[in-house]
Amino acid sequence: MVRGVYIQRASAEHMTVEAALRRYLREVTPTKRESTQAGEHKKAKALIQHLGRYSLAALNAELIAQFRDMRLAGDVDEKGKTIPRSNNTVRLELALLSHLFTVAIKEWGIGLPVNPVSNIRRPAPGAGRNRRLTKDEQKRLWSAVNAYSNPMFRWIVKIALETGMRLSEITTLRISQVDLDRRIVRLEHTKNSTPRTVPLTIQASQAFTEALDHPIRPPETDLIFFGEPGKDGKRRPYLFDKAWTDAKATAGLTDFRFHDLRHEAVSRFVEAGLSDQEVSAISGHKSMQMLKRYTHLRAEDLVAKLDRLKA
């Protein structure tokens, strides 16, 4: 009984978090973008591992707060190594869990008086990464990437570094989105839901040309970067997690993330003298505030310009 209203809790007591998440992945996740779907499956795996055994009725704010703190402090992997998770990773895991409860209460008729995730503190957003590649690191990375047998891996890394596109934007590209005559790529489905057109450098154009003209390309898919056919016969975006991990290890760059290639690309746009508006048009940053982490580059450039004024 909550505020004079009787709530039937039987369904919440019988459905586990694991069962609810698997239903969510079947019914809700497929309605989202492909890149979001992959991320939700990964987050659900962590939630199931740590909270899956509890019923929806039993999972309270205290247990969720313990999960939050444990993930931030670091849980032990299969090799016995403690791996802390970033604030943003934990925030996203909690966001998925929260939406699971919202859907269960509003759409599945699960009798719960409140979403328990709403009663806990979320980790503060982490500071933006500022990882850049040195010339020596880039040389080592390219040596490792070029040694990989599948050329799609090399093309994807090159395009990421030349264009600043996100991984999901690159791996889900269709042939119709690339116009090599005009040297542009049209992105319809982006992280911030705003379509944009990305200009291509000569190096990026060469990578796309090689990808589209390569004899390994099967005729039955319009994906530019494709994997092997699934059980249903369909090809899905190329996955190269292991290749990237191996390349980083070979290059001695274990702390370097694929998304850092985007930061490197945008930083180079700024260093090349592009205006904030031009950089935003290419990268898709929605506001000048989001580009602030790159402004220190402009400040350093201004020092030399100010010196020339006094000359």
Which residues fall in each region the model found?
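N-terminal DNA-binding module of tyrosine recombinases/phage integrases
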Residues: 1-66, 220-221
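Phosphate-coordinating loops and pocket residues in cytosolic domains that bind phosphorylated ligands
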Residues: 22, 58-61, 66, 73, ...
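Basic, Lys/Arg- and aromatic-enriched nucleic-acid-binding interface segment
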Residues: 80-87, 91-96, 106, 110-167, ...
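C-terminal catalytic core of tyrosine-transesterase DNA break-rejoin enzymes
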Residues: 88, 106, 158, 162-169, ...
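C-terminal flanking helix
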Residues: 98-101, 105, 298-302
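Catalytic-site neighborhood detector that most strongly recognizes the C-terminal catalytic loop/helix
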Residues: 132, 189-193, 276, 283-308
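Active-site/catalytic core of tyrosine-dependent DNA strand-transfer enzymes
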Residues: 136, 201-254
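C-terminal secondary-structure termini that scaffold catalytic or DNA-interacting sites
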Residues: 143, 182, 213-219, 227-231, ...
